[in-house]
């Protein structure tokens, strides 16, 4: 349990916003505006004529019913779509459960209270003891990373938006929930390696289905202890700034959270609660500095939606939050590619040098180098070893998985090949 809480502090309120932002490396400007969920690019794809199209309609429909014509391209066959859609099934059950009430839980609405809060409360010896127990329980339920932060209204949507009735409505997170438990679930490395493909979308579906069970289970555990709790996925608020405040990782050039354990290959969930717990400090391991010299995601993005410049307050369109100096992604270009491909895209995750299996010593060394002045050497080494290349989906179906030794062989074989080429000259 000790390594789980190495960056924990016993503070229950934001007593100094400026200090809190500095710790999280947030640069908030005077023209900051909270975000309206209606402007999220996925919500816009339902009401905004600039985003909504026949392709976007088919894109969404393909997750619920078969396409009329299957593509023959590797990774886009009926089998690939069948697997992708099956991985979404658990998440879809919750999302569709109350559609007749104009609710899409987990995406437009937080999950409701399925069981009452116990009348008698379980008390803990200290906020740290409470945090330790909740983190342990969350991991038992399947969370891969867990952090705790304070409720920060700046990240809450000003309004929620219904994809079905196309109407705005109040954000109904109950008052008094001052603590947020943020969870991260890793996505499958080998599936992500096949992107772009419908097959790779299974990594996303597995992540969301897993996420739903984790946040619902943790929330119910808290209710059973006598504390109010609300489970949430993409609904109600922006996940990434909360995850950064909770110490799960740093912000990357591609606009994603980069964790120390899995890089950007995670799905995020959260639970709002009134159980007093020790909070986690933001984590820094050199991501901002490394992303400053790396352009892997910028070069890899098929539609050039990722900036190659320095962090800025510039926004591309209404789907970007205003008033924060950071790297910003053009969501309109990004979603347009999703709709055109008829499946979600994770190329920026696949090519990211932080997308590794850190149970291996070599990758741990590389992560350490990325946080030092030797980061350029690490980047060169990463490219030399051939990381981030696309795997043919048919190889995944044949059972081929990530092989650590192959990368080592590639490194030395490429060196030998170079020497042989020089001799031929």
Model-identified regions with their sequence ranges:
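Flanking helices and flexible, charged tails adjoining ferredoxin-like Fe-S electron-transfer domains
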Residues: 2-36, 309-425
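Catalytic cores of enzyme domains
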Residues: 124, 135, 141-356, 364-371
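Amphipathic repeat-derived elements
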Residues: 96-121, 252-281, 397, 401
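Non-catalytic, usually N-terminal nucleic-acid engagement modules in DNA/RNA processing proteins
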Residues: 1-191, 197
């Amino acid at each position: 349990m000790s390594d789980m809480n190495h960056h924990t502090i016993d503070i229950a309120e934001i007593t100094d916003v400026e200090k809190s932002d500095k710790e999280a490396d947030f640069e908030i400007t005077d023209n900051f505006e909270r975000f309206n969920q209606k402007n999220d690019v996925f919500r816009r794809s339902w009401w905004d004529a600039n985003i909504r199209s026949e392709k976007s309609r088919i894109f969404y429909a393909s997750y619920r019913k078969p396409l009329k014509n299957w593509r023959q391209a590797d990774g886009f066959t009926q089998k690939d779509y069948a697997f992708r859609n099956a991985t979404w099934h658990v998440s879809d059950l919750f999302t569709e459960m109350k559609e007749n009430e104009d609710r899409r839980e987990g995406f437009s609405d937080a999950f409701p209270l399925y069981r009452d809060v116990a009348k008698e409360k379980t008390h803990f010896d200290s906020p740290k003891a409470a945090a330790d127990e909740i983190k342990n329980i969350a991991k038992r339920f399947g969370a891969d990373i867990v952090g705790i932060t304070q409720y920060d209204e700046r990240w809450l949507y000003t309004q929620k938006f219904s994809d079905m009735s196309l109407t705005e409505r109040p954000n109904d997170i109950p008052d008094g929930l001052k603590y947020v438990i943020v969870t991260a679930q890793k996505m499958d490395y080998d599936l992500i390696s096949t992107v772009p493909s419908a097959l790779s979308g299974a990594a996303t579906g597995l992540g969301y289905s897993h996420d739903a069970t984790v946040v619902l289970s943790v929330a119910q555990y808290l209710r059973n202890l006598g504390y109010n709790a609300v489970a949430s996925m993409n609904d109600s608020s922006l996940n990434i700034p909360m995850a950064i405040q909770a110490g799960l990782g740093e912000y990357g050039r591609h606009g994603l959270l980069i964790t120390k354990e899995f890089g950007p290959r995670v799905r995020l969930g959260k639970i709002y609660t009134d159980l007093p717990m020790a909070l986690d400090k933001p984590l820094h391991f050199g991501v901002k500095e490394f992303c400053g010299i790396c352009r892997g995601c910028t070069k890899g993005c098929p539609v050039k939606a990722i900036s190659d410049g320095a962090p800025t307050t510039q926004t591309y369109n209404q789907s970007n939050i205003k008033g924060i100096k950071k790297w910003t992604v053009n969501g309109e270009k990004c979603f347009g590619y999703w709709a055109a491909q008829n499946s979600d895209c994770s190329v920026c995750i696949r090519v990211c040098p932080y997308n590794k299996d850190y149970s291996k010593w070599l990758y741990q060394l590389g992560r350490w180098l990325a946080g030092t002045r030797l980061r350029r050497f690490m980047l060169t080494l990463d490219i030399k070893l051939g990381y981030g290349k696309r795997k043919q989906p048919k190889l995944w179906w044949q059972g081929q998985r990530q092989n650590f030794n192959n990368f080592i062989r590639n490194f030395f074989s490429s060196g030998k090949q170079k020497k042989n080429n020089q001799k031929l000259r």
